[in-house]
Amino acid sequence: MLRRIKEVGGSLEDMVRVYCLQIRCLSEIACPVWNGALTKSDIKRIERTQKMALKIILGSEYRWYDEALDRCGLILLSTRRHDICLKFAQSIEKSQKFNSWLKKTVCQTRTSEKYSIPFTRTKIYETSPLIYLTKLLNSNP
């Protein structure tokens, strides 16, 4: 899709807009559910899609990934997913219906966290969305 727009003579802004609306959104579908379970290799693979899109958009002007991100006004996909998950966790926190999912910490200590993290016995439960979002809320004031 991006290659065809480039062949027809689309501008940089148009190609970035198409990338954001048609391609990037696919990598962010339901990310609060699966982001906590991503491995480092998964993160690299997802980031590679944006890297390839920027190489297509910029063509011979592409030098480094960070420079391409700045030029196109984009951020790392991992940062974007983190922000989306944080917004989702904050909306759960404010929700009358779903705030019961988060258990408040019973005792106050100097390093007390706002929410207690449930005990996990398996790696699958440890990377579940509820645990991930609770840790996310505790790490952000």
Where would I find each of the regions flagged by the language model?
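Hydrophobic/basic alpha-helical segments
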Residues: M1-P141
